[in-house]
Amino acid sequence: MSSSQEPSTATHPVRRFKDAGYVEVASTLAELRQRIDALDTRIVGLLAERAACVRDATRFKRDAFQVAAPARQAEVFEKVRALAAHHEDDFPGLPDVVEATYRTLVAGFIAGEDRLFQQTEPIEWPCPSCPRP
């Protein structure tokens, strides 16, 4: 049976997992949504920190190919899939969700880094105040 109503956030669960080992995270949907909102706040903060690192990495790139860094992208996607696989018992298919999320995330960061790259200029050598590459 399908419902066209959003679930009540104050009531108790209306379904249970068949897995006897399942451990609930909260007793109401409202509590779960509060936890999710808090996690979203932390995630956005971490994304902002990642963005600062991506911006700084722009200084080390010579051209658009290096900005895109396809080998690094493949490395990141493989790494996050492996990390997510450790948690797949909690959420089946998590590696697929994480990889899809990271593919979107990385595409957005590369687009931003490409725009930032256009705002840089090559360092002329010798530069007395600059360390050698």
Predicted feature locations:
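Domain-level signature for soluble enzymes in the chorismate/prephenate branch of the shikimate pathway
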Residues: S2-P133
